[in-house]
């Protein structure tokens, strides 16, 4: 794991937004990444669009469709990161990709390219923990963190996954696919307590956070939150405006205001 990611996760109270690369166009992705940094993002999770995204709900599936329709690929998505860096992005970037595009690209080639491009880590939701060793070794060679996902399961399995965790541990906060949920799963608190006891690294909660109240609640039990579907939905609502250079800035500003509303309580007058 490199210094940039190590320093970022040390701070605690992490805000990790997710966006899909190329949704709806590459220029919008760069502008949104910089906007999320302005809002206080500690780490950016950059999703690689995929035609069969099993772990994603309809909002992120639609984002993938939009990005793929625009010609986005794994290679092109990775190449956005040095452009973001050139524009002033300083926070760590974690790439979220399914195993199939990664296998086609090649583990070694991916890790070398990611390192060259200023990418800090990788998250592969459909790669079983038991089959992750080869990729973990390639990541280690290049100083990339292979982020582990952990779901409510046996204490023994949580301990096994946590013992090899790098960077931070990504906890699934509600059962099933991702998506903005109104309520959190009732067993989440007990699950997070188990993770806290087992994890040597900070742990964050994702999959379903969509309000300031949920962010605050999760902050009491975890070291941070991942917010994906709620942000991606706002991008989808402004898809046409984000495609056009003349309307993009205003659309990005509106999304930034929405993100700020998730992180700060509404003012009381």
UniProtKB/Swiss-Prot annotation:
Enzyme class: lyase
Key words, A-Z: Amino-acid biosynthesis, Aromatic amino acid biosynthesis, Lyase, Tryptophan biosynthesis
EC numbers on record: 4.2.1.20
Annotated InterPro entries: Aldolase_TIM, RibuloseP-bd_barrel, Trp_synthase_alpha_AS, Trp_synthase_suA
Highest taxon in the source lineage: Bacteria
GO cellular component: cytosol
Known pathway: Amino-acid biosynthesis; L-tryptophan biosynthesis; L-tryptophan from chorismate: step 5/5
Molecular function per GO: tryptophan synthase activity
Active-site feature positions: 45 (proton acceptor), 56 (proton acceptor)
Pfam families according to UniProt: Trp_syntA
Gene3D superfamilies documented for this protein: Aldolase class I
Cited SUPFAM superfamilies: Ribulose-phoshate binding barrel
Catalytic activity: (1S,2R)-1-C-(indol-3-yl)glycerol 3-phosphate + L-serine = D-glyceraldehyde 3-phosphate + L-tryptophan + H2O
Protein family: Belongs to the TrpA family.
Assembly information from the UniProt record: Tetramer of two alpha and two beta chains.
Matching HAMAP family: Trp_synth_alpha
Job description of the protein: The alpha subunit is responsible for the aldol cleavage of indoleglycerol phosphate to indole and glyceraldehyde 3-phosphate.
UniProt protein name: Tryptophan synthase alpha chain
